[in-house]
Structures are given as C-alpha cells and as structure tokens.
C-alpha cells in the first residue's frame, strides 16, 4: 500500500481509501463459484439479490444475512494470500471474503450496514476490480448522502471504528454503466 486518503471522519469512525495492487487471478478463482442473484428475505418477503455473490472462508461455516445462510467455499491459494495480506496491512483478524459481482449498472445493493449478528463490525475492508461504480455513503440519522466515492480498480475502501453504526453504504443503480465490477469484502465472522 502506497498511500491513504481519509474521505469520511467522525469522532468515532472513518472511511479511508488506499492504493493496492490487486492480483487478477483472484477473479479467475471466484468467477465460476458465485451464485447468480440468490434469494434473500427482506421484510418477510422472498426476493432475489441484484448481483451475484459468493462467500469464501476456511474458518467460517458461512455468512448469514437477510434470513439466509450463504455457505462458505474454501479459500484458494490466491484468496488465502489476499486475506493474509489484508490482515497484515490492517492489523485485523479477517477470516472471510464476500465476493459480489455486478454485471452492469442495473445490478446494485441497497443502503445497508455490515452489522449482522456473527460478524465483528469495527473493521470492514473492500477491494474493487473492474468498471468504476459509485460507493454511496449515507448518514444513518438523517439518510443524507455524505459521500459518493468512485470504486476505482485496485482501490481499498476501509471502514473503521463505529462506521457501521453511524453510516450506511450502497452501490446504486447506474443504468448507463455497461461493464462488470467485482468487490471483495473482508470481515471477521464468528460463526
């Protein structure tokens, strides 16, 4: 990592952007292991996610969110190296990687916080690869947009401190965007 820029900061949380050389072999490793727009439960209704997803871990049985358990697939050597590298760079104990694939600008994820039961919320790190999309931050108290951050390839977004309790984040619909985007999100899972 060569540089870091702070884009959001409060007394108890922050969002930093870091430079990183991402190994594209990780894309090859996960490409065929992602579930295409799997089901989740939102407000008691079954619906499909608007992106493809996969969860990779050698320690966690899976990632439970929105009423469903996504079972973990084993880490490949490339993913294991990437996970170890993130833990060294951020002095964390991440043990799982959630991979999202956005096919184009109609794929999205709504405003949310990574604060589900079973994950430690003080550090969440995400690496982007592919087409630039908007990573939108909103204040939880009034839902106002705090920042629109371009997800440039190889950039790390590091949400730390109480960020998940103070803010939401999302990848909004951007109909004009045609390209593919992957995100690799690192967390510590206790299940």
Regions found by a protein language model. Name each.
Residues 1-191:
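Non-heme Fe(II) oxygenase metal-center motifs and adjacent flexible, charged/small-residue loops
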